[in-house]
């Protein structure tokens, strides 16, 4: 309603000071304007925004051809929208980002333009934009709460003023309000005059008259109706009071402003509506949303302090199943992409000895002069050597004589094949322990002295301590698995189980650290097969976005494990699983058609962090130096993944984080802001939208892969001391902000 807020375009100066009841925000459309308060003058040029807060004294002076527009919110309207509105004080500072200034101006330009056009849907659009403007101010404009502003030196007088401004239309008396604040009438009257320079009744009548002016200007209601709805007992009483304050009768005041309609009131002076709309169009940009769906506000103040903490990056181990899969050019491309994006340099392949034993025991004999039984293996080794990948091979059921003989033939051939080239980093991985491993590892180490032995740990490991002790000199790493889904019955809604599941990976890690320390077998750990909560089906695994949960686990593990394992892609992973539950034991980086899953981008963003930790808390870590640092913020909510499938119990929530980085060196900084959440980088959202009963064609595949990336925003900002960031965090989302100061010129 027009009485809730005013939308104005001004082309003439305002000669006298007024005290504002409510909140005003505007900007200079053209030319130059001087905005005055009690103590200062602010010069505003085209595009500059100004804010006038509740009870501020203000006036403006427009220079030649100057035009300003503003939206003035009445205090009663603001009080209906949020608590303590009368205490809210907005202030634009150097820390208010250019992006947020643009967005505020964009909303206001749209709002004023819509107001001027006055078409069929103007009212509805106008109200949407008004709410958007308020929401944007609340979320992105720095503010404080002034419970006692400078013009009032007494809290109780402040309370009385607030009460009058919200209840001016009611029958108010000094007696009633003195009882409201617990003072005598004489004491309240004295304090009121001391604080405001006018008496109680004068302030009450001024407030009522200002609201009555709005009704006279913007409504066709009768004088009597206007009098009664603004707190006057009769039309005669209203007319007397109105003339005392304005030197006009209500009828004369309305007559001086004939037929001012809402679309006409903005086109003052020499400007027509079309000219104003053209000027406003220069400030209008595309907007993604009308309404911000923020459910929670969070404030972080960060100042960097010296710390001895270090963040360790992981050695990533990629499982490819059978070694021959390395001959697939698509898989090769995926490995090279991982190597480029987050330094993947180790491949884990299944045991090749059954394949070699089959060839060695074939019913015909291979002629070494015209054939090579290791031909395809050599091609795989060449790919690894060409791109500096190390090879880790899983040895399985190796306790037979035939197996050991085949193993020696294979190892001897590999040693010969790589002898003329740079060394291949070669590791062996065993999940079961047999005495035959002693003979095999001795032979292996003779040919590959830098080769490693990986031993899998589980609850049965302690039964093999004597053998472990004998192998200890050769052991490089211990390997273990941890799957959070094992801790939960997904058919139940037991919060305790989900709380336990959230700690499953770190608790299992600590268990094995304690185990190897107790037996003096200290070696680095590799977490090979692992997963966070996903549910126990393919559907929940895709629909339940968990980027923040994964990054939370990586941060907790970075000081405890050296290596992290992934499957390369969905097809390889699922082809080596017995059932859906088995599939949930591990995570893959790629889906089909080279689509990158969010875990891929999680690893990529984690890899952008540097080792020196400047700050950390439960949902944030900052690494780097004070002039070149990375801010990682994340949300990690562990809940039943099946709730992600229920539209009636949608667990998506949005939090606005106001982050201030203080005490930065003055200068120009470059900001790169990556956002990974269910709206930015979640592959399955787009996949399902573009998948038909016949699958996906090339255009759909290319589009989905092109769009399934984290959002990236890049901009420069001039910082004097504080970097202020406003971050919209969706459930289990991740934000990485890279901040780098440009060298001084």
Swiss-Prot record:
The keyword Signal does not apply. It holds the Pfam family HTH_18. Residues 175-196, 223-246 bind DNA. InterPro entries: Glycoside_hydrolase_SF, Homeodomain-like_sf, HTH-like, HTH_AraC, Tscrpt_reg_AraC-type_HTH. The keyword Aminoacyl-tRNA synthetase does not apply. One of its GO terms (molecular function) is DNA-binding transcription factor activity. SUPFAM superfamilies: (Trans)glycosidases (SSF51445), Glycosyl hydrolase domain (SSF51011), Homeodomain-like (SSF46689), Regulatory protein AraC (SSF51215). Keywords: DNA-binding, Repeat, Transcription, Transcription regulation. SMART domains: HTH_ARAC (SM00342). Gene3D superfamilies: Glycosidases (3.20.20.80), Glycosyl hydrolase domain, family 39 (2.60.40.1500), Homeodomain-like (1.10.10.60). This is Uncharacterized HTH-type transcriptional regulator SAS0078. The lineage of its organism: Bacteria, Bacillati, Bacillota, Bacilli, Bacillales.
């Amino acid at each position: 309603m027009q009485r809730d807020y005013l939308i104005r375009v001004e082309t003439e100066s305002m000669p006298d000071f007024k005290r504002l009841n409510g909140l005003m925000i505007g900007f200079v459309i053209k030319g130059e304007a001087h905005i005055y308060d009690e103590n200062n003058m602010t010069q505003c040029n085209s595009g500059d925004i100004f804010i006038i807060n509740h009870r501020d004294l203000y006036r403006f002076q427009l220079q030649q051809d100057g035009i300003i527009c503003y939206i003035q919110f009445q205090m009663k309207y603001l009080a209906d929208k949020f608590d303590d509105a009368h205490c809210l004080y907005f202030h634009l500072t150097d820390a208010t980002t250019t992006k947020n200034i643009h967005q505020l101006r964009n909303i206001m330009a749209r709002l004023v333009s819509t107001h001027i056009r006055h078409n069929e849907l103007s009212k509805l659009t106008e109200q949407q934009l008004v709410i958007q403007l308020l929401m944007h101010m609340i979320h992105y404009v720095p503010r404080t709460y002034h419970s006692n502003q400078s013009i009032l030196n007494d809290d109780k007088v402040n309370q009385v003023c607030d009460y009058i401004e919200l209840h001016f239309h009611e029958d108010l008396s000094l007696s009633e309000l003195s009882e409201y604040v617990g003072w005598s009438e004489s004491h309240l009257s004295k304090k009121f005059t001391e604080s405001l320079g006018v008496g109680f009744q004068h302030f009450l009548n001024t407030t009522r008259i200002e609201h009555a002016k709005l009704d006279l200007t913007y409504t066709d209601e009768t004088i009597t109706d206007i009098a009664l709805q603004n707190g006057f007992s009769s039309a005669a009483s209203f007319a007397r009071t109105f003339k005392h304050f304005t030197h006009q009768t209500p009828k004369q005041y309305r007559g001086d402003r004939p037929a001012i309609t809402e679309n006409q009131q903005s086109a003052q002076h020499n400007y027509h509506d079309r000219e104003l709309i053209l000027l406003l169009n220069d400030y209008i940009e595309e907007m993604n949303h009308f309404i911000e769906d923020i459910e929670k506000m969070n404030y972080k103040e960060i100042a960097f302090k010296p710390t001895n903490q270090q963040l360790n990056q992981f050695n990533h181990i990629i499982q490819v199943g059978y070694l021959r899969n390395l001959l697939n050019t698509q898989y090769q491309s995926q490995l090279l992409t991982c190597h480029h994006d987050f330094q993947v340099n180790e491949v884990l392949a299944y045991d090749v000895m059954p394949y070699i034993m089959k060839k060695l025991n074939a019913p015909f004999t291979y002629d070494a002069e015209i054939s090579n039984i290791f031909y395809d293996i050599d091609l795989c080794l060449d790919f690894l050597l060409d791109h500096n990948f190390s090879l880790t091979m899983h040895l399985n059921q190796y306790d037979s004589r035939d197996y050991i003989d085949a193993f020696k033939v294979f190892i001897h051939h590999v040693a010969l094949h790589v002898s003329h080239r740079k060394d291949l980093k070669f590791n062996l991985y065993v999940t079961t322990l047999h005495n035959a491993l002693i003979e095999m590892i001795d032979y292996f180490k003779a040919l590959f002295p830098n080769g490693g032995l990986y031993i899998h740990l589980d609850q049965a490991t302690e039964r093999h301590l004597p053998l472990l002790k004998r192998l200890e000199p050769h052991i490089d790493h211990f390997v273990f698995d941890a799957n959070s889904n094992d801790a939960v019955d997904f058919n139940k809604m037991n919060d305790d189980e989900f709380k336990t599941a959230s700690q499953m990976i770190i608790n299992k890690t600590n268990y094995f650290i304690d185990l190897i320390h107790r037996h003096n077998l200290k070696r680095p750990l590799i977490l090979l097969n692992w997963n966070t909560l996903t549910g126990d089906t393919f559907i929940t695994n895709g629909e339940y976005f968990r980027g923040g949960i994964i990054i939370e686990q990586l941060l907790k593990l970075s000081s405890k494990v050296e290596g992290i394992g992934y499957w390369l892609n969905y097809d390889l992973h699922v082809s080596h699983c017995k059932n859906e539950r088995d599939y949930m034991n591990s995570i893959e980086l790629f889906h089909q058609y080279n689509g990158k899953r969010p875990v891929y981008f999680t690893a990529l963003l984690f890899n952008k962090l540097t080792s020196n930790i400047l700050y950390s808390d439960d949902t944030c870590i900052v690494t780097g130096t004070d002039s070149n640092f990375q801010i990682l913020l994340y949300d990690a909510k562990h809940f039943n993944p099946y709730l992600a499938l229920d539209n009636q119990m949608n667990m998506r929530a949005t939090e606005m984080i106001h982050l201030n980085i203080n005490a930065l060196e003055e200068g120009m900084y470059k900001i790169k802001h990556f956002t990974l959440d269910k709206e930015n980088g979640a592959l399955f959202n787009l996949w399902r939208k573009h998948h038909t009963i016949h699958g996906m064609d090339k255009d759909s595949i290319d589009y989905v892969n092109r769009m399934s990336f984290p959002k990236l925003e890049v901009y420069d900002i001039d910082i004097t001391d504080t970097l202020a960031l406003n971050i919209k965090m969706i459930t289990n989302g991740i934000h990485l902000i890279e901040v780098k100061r440009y060298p001084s010129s």
